[in-house]
């Protein structure tokens, strides 16, 4: 990895470490999403505690954390594998933010933002998959898991040179959802819009 790639990777992690959910909740004088609801600083939990406006703001900011560094690397001509490393660094920053005591979110929105520079057709298909599963079953975590499982295949169809880094990124997100998988199997996972949760760290 050359100096430019290393700098881009470090910058991606630091940008990913800026917790949009925590900062937006502070700005709107809402409870800290790490301490209420599902205890997850992501758009789904902010939707529960702050409504649609706050959740959309978090979603867009989290996506930009992935888009900005990957798009920068893309235009600088960085190798696809290194672009994947940059994307993973941004998601790791979101999941384990150095600025917020390493207590972060699940990385779905940031990963979507990181995939966007590959192509709008791929991004649209990924978003359509998430929305379809979410509308049908009303589980944010299930929608995320189904989406990340099929995204490497979508990538292979549209831009096969990016399949490996995208698959690596998807594996990271599946790992971060291990508790959600357990709750889905036991029927304890809360649905989108539910206010009360019985366990921490849902979607």
Swiss-Prot record:
One of its GO terms (molecular function) is acyl-phosphate glycerol-3-phosphate acyltransferase activity. One of its GO terms (biological process) is phospholipid biosynthetic process. Its EC number is 2.3.1.275. Pathway: Lipid metabolism; phospholipid metabolism. InterPro entries: G3P_acylTferase_PlsY. Keywords: Cell inner membrane, Cell membrane, Lipid biosynthesis, Lipid metabolism, Membrane, Phospholipid biosynthesis, Phospholipid metabolism, Transferase, Transmembrane, Transmembrane helix. The chain crosses the membrane at residues 4-24, 68-88, 117-137, 155-175. One of its GO terms (cellular component) is plasma membrane. It is found in: Cell inner membrane. It comes from the Bacteria. It catalyses: an acyl phosphate + sn-glycerol 3-phosphate = a 1-acyl-sn-glycero-3-phosphate + phosphate. Its main location: membrane. It is a multi-pass membrane protein. Probably interacts with PlsX. Catalyzes the transfer of an acyl group from acyl-phosphate (acyl-PO(4)) to glycerol-3-phosphate (G3P) to form lysophosphatidic acid (LPA). This enzyme utilizes acyl-phosphate as fatty acyl donor, but not acyl-CoA or acyl-ACP. Belongs to the PlsY family. This is Glycerol-3-phosphate acyltransferase. The lineage of its organism: Bacteria, Pseudomonadati, Pseudomonadota, Gammaproteobacteria, Vibrionales.
